[in-house]
Every structure is written in C-alpha cells, then in structure tokens.
C-alpha cells in the first residue's frame, strides 16, 4: 500500500479527498513538516511546503519516491544532497500569481502613502496631512520573470507605471517596457522607484540584493522581497534602511523564519513585515486540489512523465 504523508496546515482538508479518490492509499497527516519527521521512514510520498526540508530530514525518508511541494519554491528540496536522484519532485506552481501581485501592491501603496502613519494617527485621533507619493509615472523593476511577475506587470501598467524586468534570458514579455540581464541588475536598480524581488532562490542567487545593488538605488526607492529571504543580504539592507539610503522595504520573507523577535527589522518605521503569506488566498485550496489529484493519479498509474509542474533535476 502506498503511504502518503501530508505534512501541511491544510492536510485535514485534503486528506478526506485523497482517501475518497484513492481508497487504496494510506494517508498520514501532520500540521507541519517538523511534526511529521518521525513518520518520514513510512512515506512513499510527502506533500509539504517546499521550504522546510533539509538533508537530515530527507535522509530519514528511505522509501521516498515523490515529493510534492505545496508551494512554488522548491530550493530546500532540490538542493538537498540526501534527495535520491530517482525521487520525483513536483510543485504547486501556477496558482499564486494574482494574490502575490496584490500583495506587491499592498506594499507599494502602503509605503508610498505611508499608511502605517495614517493608521497610527487614526488611533491617536490626530488629523495630519503631508505630501503623498503616487504610483502613476513611477518605475517598477521586477527580478525573475515567472508567472508571478507576469501577473504583476499588467497590474503595474494599469496604474500607469513603467515596468522593467530582470531575467537570466532577456526577451520580450507582454506588460514589460524593457528587459535586463542579471548582469545588468545594478543598472536596472538605479532606475527603480520600486524594486520587486521575485527571483527563485538558488545558491548562485544568494544575496542577489547586496550592498552594491542597494547603493545603486534612489534614496526615495523601495525594496520589496516576496521570493526568498536568502536573496537579500539582510545586513546590507539594514544598513541602507537605517541610513536612509533607500526609503523603505516591504518584506514577506527572511533568512530565518519565523523572524526572530530580536530582529531590528521589527522596529523600523520604514519597513512593512508580513509572515511569508503573500501566496495565500481564500481559493488556494480549490486551485491546489486539481494539481494534487492529477499528479497522484499519474503517480499511482506510473505515468510520471504526465505529472503537472514536474521539476527536471
């Protein structure tokens, strides 16, 4: 009997569907990956968020044949030395574009209009006005040209913004005014009013946003990171924020998560923090189930080549 370990906060939603659709499988659930590790030796299949894996955990999964990441990112899995070469890896790529684009706008509007200050004034019953920054006419630079960037670009255009892209292989993409290679990131960053990081994480991309890139940005520019914490040199970012070399940042991801309570980021007036939730939406579950169902059927019927979002390793 195929044993499926579903280690995710939404496992209890999907487990009955799996049992009903595939009655011949055994389903074990856990609220998250750490709590599920003792069950790793039993698992033929693991479904979990893509960022919680490491060599020590994967080494326990001796029967493992397939991992499905309940996220777009899979760097913590694919980069593991303990992952056998024959283990199948799939992701939930394709469902997060609209909500992550909306989160980028939440950051841009809040930072540009200084909404935290407005909200604080409301609580204090203070009537105060200041010059507002509008998005119309501003330049947004987006690193990483996947489905999320393709969802964000037309929304930026609808706001009257100039949209520049940074990617490994520059090419014409609808919604983008101009493309740059990663080797030209410093040049692109100098043009940005908003630099939005959507690049997939890899060792080669670690600290993509570093002191050099931050120094190239305008003093009035904002950095948004919705991808992975490892893409940003956090020490360099803290220095740039403290010394007002950039205007502020919207950060959904960090190198250490949850963000430690003692982190200086928490107390910075020019930083907006969210808890790695930019991909969340009220219809994620409904959009995810068809991917899981299709891939499970393909896996059980040995049609692995037909699985959705199959990662080539």
Stretches found by the model and what they are:
Residues 44-119:
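Phosphate/diphosphate ligand-binding glycine-rich loop within oxidoreductases
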Residues 98, 149-150, 211:
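Residues forming the Rossmann-fold NAD(P)(H) cofactor-binding site
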Residues 118-151, 178-179:
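Glycine-rich NAD(P)-binding loop of Rossmann-like domains
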């Amino acid at each position: 009997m195929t044993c499926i370990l579903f280690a995710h906060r939404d496992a209890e939603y999907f487990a009955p569907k799996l049992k009903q659709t595939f009655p011949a499988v055994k389903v074990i659930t856990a609220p998250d990956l750490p709590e599920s590790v003792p069950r790793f030796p039993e698992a033929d299949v693991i479904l979990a968020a893509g960022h919680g894996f490491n060599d020590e955990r994967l080494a326990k999964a001796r029967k493992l044949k397939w991992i499905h990441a309940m996220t777009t990112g899979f760097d913590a899995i694919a980069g593991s030395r303990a992952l056998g070469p024959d283990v199948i890896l799939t992701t939930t790529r394709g469902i997060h574009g609209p909500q992550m684009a909306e989160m980028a706008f939440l950051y841009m509007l809040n930072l540009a209009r200084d909404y935290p200050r407005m909200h604080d004034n409301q609580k204090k019953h203070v009537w105060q006005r200041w010059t507002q920054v509008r998005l119309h006419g501003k330049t947004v630079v987006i690193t990483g040209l996947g489905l999320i960037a393709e969802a964000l670009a037309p929304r930026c255009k609808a706001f009257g913004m100039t949209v520049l892209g940074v990617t490994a292989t520059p090419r014409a993409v609808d919604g983008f005014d101009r493309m740059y290679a990663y080797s030209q990131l410093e040049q692109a960053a100098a043009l940005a009013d908003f630099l939005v990081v959507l690049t997939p994480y890899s060792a080669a991309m670690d600290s993509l946003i570093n002191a050099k890139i931050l120094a190239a940005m305008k003093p009035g520019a904002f950095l948004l990171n919705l991808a992975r914490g490892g893409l940003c040199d956090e020490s360099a970012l803290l220095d740039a924020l403290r010394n007002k070399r950039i205007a502020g940042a919207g950060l959904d991801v960090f190198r250490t998560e949850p963000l430690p309570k003692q982190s200086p980021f928490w107390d910075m007036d020019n930083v907006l923090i969210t808890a790695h939730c930019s991909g969340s939406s009220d219809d994620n579950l409904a959009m995810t189930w068809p991917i899981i169902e299709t891939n499970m059927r393909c896996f059980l019927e040995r049609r692995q080549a037909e699985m959705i979002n199959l990662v080539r390793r």
